[in-house]
From Swiss-Prot:
Binding site for isopentenyl diphosphate: 41, 74, 125, 226-228, 270
Name of this protein: 4-hydroxy-3-methylbut-2-enyl diphosphate reductase
Gene: ispH
Species lineage: Bacteria, Pseudomonadati, Pseudomonadota, Gammaproteobacteria, Enterobacterales
Gene Ontology MF terms in the entry: 4 iron, 4 sulfur cluster binding; 4-hydroxy-3-methylbut-2-enyl diphosphate reductase activity; metal ion binding
Cofactor mode of binding and number, as noted: Binds 1 [4Fe-4S] cluster per subunit.
Keywords of the record: 4Fe-4S, Iron, Iron-sulfur, Isoprene biosynthesis, Metal-binding, Oxidoreductase
Cross-referenced NCBIfam families: ispH_lytB (TIGR00216), PRK01045.1-2 (NF002188), PRK01045.1-4 (NF002190)
Binding site for [4Fe-4S] cluster: 12, 97, 198
Naturally occurring in which organism (per UniProt): Photorhabdus laumondii subsp. laumondii (strain DSM 15139 / CIP 105565 / TT01)
Length: 317
């Protein structure tokens, strides 16, 4: 049995930055550090940060005075940001992915201009809640759609004053169908100058499509609440291959790979490489005898942490 590794896979620049912000805050200021929502959607990452002194909360009211607070990579609404700033906090750091912030700016711009805005995204996802929360113009409107059917059922105030944007971690194929419906339903709608679906989401979906075309079964390392990881498993299934979303090597069931020649392995943008390595070791214990990494797009994007966290511990001692 051979293991095929998708390329690229695992951490993206936004996730790497968000985790680094929490780690640096813990190193520089010590525990506890409060984080609104899981900093990224990965159980292994969150559990490790929790052990080091990060406290994950959902409500700003849970944060005591004089504490240090970090917003997660998914972003927050203007209301949450204002609430945090009104508190007597020692420091406030924003780990929102810069590519999510780009979408926030698009929504805020639409709100200022009085344009109605339509967001393509999954209801209940924290990124969607934060993005929707950038709009505050009562004379306009902010709407959420998930499917072409939602588009055809949508009622807006002015069909000639519309724009749209998307969640950054969606299925490229599904989103294309929704955009086609938007353009058909609202011919004058304006989209973003550049795709809102981020480079990492697009690259990993392209890579898993290539992987699934060769593999007999695909294992996607990622947590159940990770949007981009779920999309990878769904895409592999659409190619016609069995695909399983796993948090760790322990989740692998032997019957998944019984009689299989090629096992494909990839990881969502919030899954660390150590989990992939553990999956490889588990597969080797079940009979895998070689590992091959596929060719893919090279990624060299880096997002800096806030300047306050780019200092040595001794500088603030």
């Amino acid at each position: 049995m051979q293991i095929l590794l998708a390329n690229p896979r695992g951490f993206c620049a936004g996730v790497d930055r968000a985790i680094s912000i929490v780690e640096r805050a813990l190193e520089l200021y010590g525990a506890p550090i409060y984080v609104r929502h899981e900093v990224v959607h990965n159980r292994y990452v969150v559990d490790n940060l929790r052990k080091r002194g990060a406290i994950f909360i959902e409500e700003i009211s849970e944060v005591p005075d004089d504490a240090i607070l970090i917003f997660s990579a998914h972003g927050v609404s203007q209301a949450i940001r204002a609430e945090a700033r009104s508190r007597n906090l020692t420091m406030l750091f924003d780990a929102t992915c810069p590519l999510v912030t780009k979408v926030h700016m698009e929504v805020a711009r639409a709100s200022r201009k009085g344009k109605e805005a339509i967001l393509i995204g999954h209801a209940g996802h924290p990124e969607v809640e934060g993005t929707m929360g950038q709009y505050n113009n009562a004379e306009g409107g902010m709407y959420l759609v998930e499917s072409p059917a939602d588009v055809w059922n949508l009622k807006v105030k002015d069909e000639d004053n519309l724009c749209f944007m998307t969640q950054t971690t969606l299925s490229v194929d599904d989103t294309s169908e929704v955009i086609d419906a938007l353009n058909a339903r609202f011919p004058n709608i304006v989209g973003p100058r550049k795709d809102d679906i981020c480079y990492a989401t697009t690259n990993r979906q392209e890579a898993v499509r290539d992987l699934a075309s060769d593999a007999d079964v695909v294992l996607v390392v990622g947590s159940k609440n990770s949007s981009n990881s779920n999309r990878l498993a769904e895409l592999a299934q659409r190619v016609g291959k069995p695909a399983y979303l796993i948090d760790s090597a322990e989740d692998i069931k032997e019957e998944w790979i019984t009689g299989i020649s090629l096992v494909g392995v990839t990881a969502g943008a919030s899954a660390p490489d150590i989990l992939v390595q553990q999956v490889i070791e588990r597969l080797k214990s079940l009979g895998a005898d070689s590992v091959q990494e596929l060719h893919g797009r090279e990624e060299n994007i880096v997002f800096e942490v806030p300047k306050e966290l780019r200092v040595e511990v001794k500088e603030i001692s």
